[in-house]
Regions:
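Long, low-complexity, charged/polar intrinsically disordered regions in eukaryotic proteins
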Residues: 1-9
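Short, conserved clusters of charged catalytic residues that mark active-site
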Residues: 10-11, 66
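N-terminal helix-turn-helix DNA-binding core of bacterial DNA-binding proteins
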Residues: 11-51, 73-82, 87
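Alpha-helical residues within the helix-turn-helix
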Residues: 43, 60-61
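Beta-hairpin "wing" of winged helix-turn-helix
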Residues: 62-76
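Conserved segment of winged-helix/HTH DNA-binding domains
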Residues: 73-107
Length: 107
């Protein structure tokens, strides 16, 4: 299981912002149950395919999702299937106290 870590307040804020979006959480839940590609997720959640693709890329960049390209007999012939990466986030007062205030702070 991936334990997400952060060393600055801005890093933690970005992660919490990413996870604080209901649609991204719904996508994570969906791809934790079964691998899917952007169009399937968009139809399931009632959002646009471009928005689903943006959210999937954000989740993948954060390490919370993995995408794998596969070919299909039907259009689109090349699809990128996503699955959730098991992860945990631990945030408590001690963690917050240990964080640097900014990414430029040296101590």
């Amino acid at each position: 299981m991936l334990t997400l870590s952060f060393s600055t307040i801005p890093e933690l804020a970005r992660l919490l912002s990413l996870l604080g979006n209901e649609q991204r959480l719904a996508i994570l839940r969906s791809i934790a149950i079964d691998e899917k590609y952007a169009r399937e997720i968009a139809e399931e959640l009632g959002i646009s395919r471009p928005l689903a693709a943006i959210y999937l890329r954000q989740l993948e960049k954060a390490g919370l999702a993995e995408g794998t390209g596969r070919t299909s007999d039907e259009p689109p012939y090349l699809r990128r299937y996503y699955r959730a990466v098991p992860f945990e986030v631990v945030v408590d007062l001690n963690v917050i106290l240990s964080l640097e205030r900014s990414e430029d702070e040296t101590g």
